Curated annotation (Swiss-Prot):
Residues 53-127 bind DNA. It is found in: Nucleus. Residues 163-407 form the NR LBD domain. Keywords: Cytoplasm, DNA-binding, Metal-binding, Nucleus, Receptor, Transcription, Transcription regulation, Zinc, Zinc-finger. 3,3',5-triiodo-L-thyronine binds at residues 228, 277. This is Thyroid hormone receptor alpha. It comes from Rattus norvegicus (Rat). One of its GO terms (molecular function) is TBP-class protein binding.
């Protein structure tokens, strides 16, 4: 029988034969099939460049339903099975049509029979439910492979060397021996009564306002808290090897940061409190009204964010060591040595984090960001409250970080005692800012004063030598305090 496939009009595929010329041929834009144009240039690696569709001879795009076919035959076969169309197909030429890329759209029955003849599998065509299940399985497999890859990458990350383990153990022991109440702080803490920090705010002569009772409670724990920070630093060999001048500068720069960090890691989300010095649990408003102002917000925010990291004692200890060995302190002598020490702690810190295998994605860079947050948020919050641009805290004339304050004595001490009552009962020098003091600055003054008193611990001086070195009321002599301390430490 003579075949005239180009004139066959029965059984056309409506989805592939939407536009035809008068002679029955399908119109093609720019002489190309739209599907072929969309797949132009794509050849799977397992196909030869000129591989042909086994059904129609057009350019193949891959394995589809167990055969190498083009996109057109793949779609035709899938639609036929999914919609169960093959029983409706018919052919006017006794199913003897020749199927090629020109005639494939003119006889659906012959095209479908050829699909079956070349081996296309009907059972591989999925219905909607099976297709959804397959996609879900694919996503599950991708997620499983992603987790396996993450585990492999964690296993391949370097862990601490024996030398780094020694550094880690020393820092951890230094932290534990100077951390008040240790891991039992929740059981031993005492909540500051609700009425403290909520009483009427007292206006100071310079216009600032503070709750004197809360302020008094906080000043009681500052000196022992600073003592523990100094003791922590002295237990680190790299710190003890530095000149006395650099030790003092580093302690002045990091003391508030380390104290804030120690308070932040003891944030309790259930009671929304911070435990100061391991013993006093305070609420945000109590800390704010007690003298720290907006700085209290920074510490509470830090505590909330750190609670998700679940840091252990070693990580807190190493974070403190990194804060201590910071080269951005003004006036340092051995900058290179301090920088190398910080790098050693950073490497040990990173390798210890790898050893713990945290489940938080990108744990290490996130933790480094928190380290910078500890340094910046406390100072910038305080500076913002005082109206200083850029968060730039004042610098002592000697280049030490004295928060823009000078040591004073005499009548000014008695004036502060009259203002603060018990909180103003200050033995030794106190601090006076060159400009009107904010409440949080007053607390920082006490912090700094205690730091001067404990600088003797760094250089091994006794109380009498410290008292004599700070006895002058002249501002010119005040600037020589740290030189005097350093000179005594160097003398036999």
């Amino acid at each position: 029988m003579e075949q005239k496939p180009s004139k066959v009009e029965c059984g056309s595929d409506p989805e592939e034969n939407s536009a035809r010329s008068p002679d029955g041929k399908r119109k093609r834009k720019n002489g190309q099939c739209p599907l072929k144009s969309s797949m132009s240039g794509y050849i799977p690696s397992y196909l030869d460049k000129d591989e042909q569709c086994v059904v129609c001879g057009d350019k193949a795009t891959g394995y589809h339903y167990r055969c190498i076919t083009c996109e057109g035959c793949k779609g035709f076969f899938r639609r036929t099975i999914q919609k169960n169309l093959h029983p409706t197909y018919s052919c006017k030429y006794d199913s003897c049509c020749v199927i090629d890329k020109i005639t494939r759209n003119q006889c659906q029955l012959c095209r479908f029979k050829k699909c079956i003849a070349v081996g296309m599998a009907m059972d591989l065509v999925l219905d909607d439910s099976k297709r959804v299940a397959k996609r879900k399985l694919i996503e599950q497999n991708r997620e499983r492979r992603r987790k396996e890859e993450m585990i492999r990458s964690l296993q391949q990350r370097p862990e601490p060397t024996p030398e780094e383990w020694d550094l880690i153990h020393v820092a951890t022991e230094a932290h534990r021996s100077t951390n008040a109440q240790g891991s039992h702080w929740k059981q031993r803490r005492k909540f500051l009564p609700d009425d403290i920090g909520q009483s009427p705010i007292v206006s100071m002569p310079d216009g600032d306002k503070v709750d004197l009772e809360a302020f008094s409670e906080f000043t009681k724990i500052i000196t022992p808290a600073i003592t523990r920070v100094v003791d922590f630093a002295k237990k680190l060999p790299m710190f003890s090897e530095l000149p006395c001048e650099d030790q003092i500068i580093l302690l002045k720069g990091c003391c508030m940061e380390i104290m804030s960090l120690r308070a932040a890691v003891r944030y309790d989300p259930e009671s929304d409190t911070l435990t100061l010095s391991g013993e006093m649990a305070v609420k945000r408003e109590q800390l704010k009204n007690g003298g720290l102002g907006v700085v209290s917000d920074a510490i509470f925010e830090l505590g909330k964010s750190l609670s998700a990291f679940n840091l252990d004692d070693t990580e807190v200890a190493l974070l403190q060591a990194v804060l201590l060995m910071s080269t951005d302190r003004s006036g340092l002598l051995c900058v290179d040595k301090i920088e190398k020490s910080q790098e050693a702690y950073l490497l040990a810190f990173e390798h210890y984090v790898n050893h713990r295998k945290h489940n938080i994605p990108h744990f290490w860079p996130k933790l480094l960001m928190k380290e910078r947050e500890v340094q910046s948020s406390i100072l910038y919050k305080g500076a913002a409250a005082e109206g200083r641009p850029g968060g730039s805290l004042g610098v002592h004339p000697e280049g030490q970080q004295l928060l823009g304050m000078h040591v004073v004595q005499g009548p000014q001490v008695r004036q502060l005692e009259q203002q603060f009552g018990e909180a103003g009962s200050l033995r030794g020098p106190v601090l006076q800012h060159q400009s009107p003091k904010s409440p949080q600055q007053r607390l920082l003054e006490l912090l700094h004063r205690s730091g001067i008193l404990h600088s003797r611990a760094v250089c091994g001086e006794d109380d009498s030598s410290e008292a004599s070195s700070l006895s002058s009321s002249s501002s010119d002599e005040d600037t020589e305090v740290f030189e005097d301390l350093a000179g005594k430490a160097a003398s036999p």
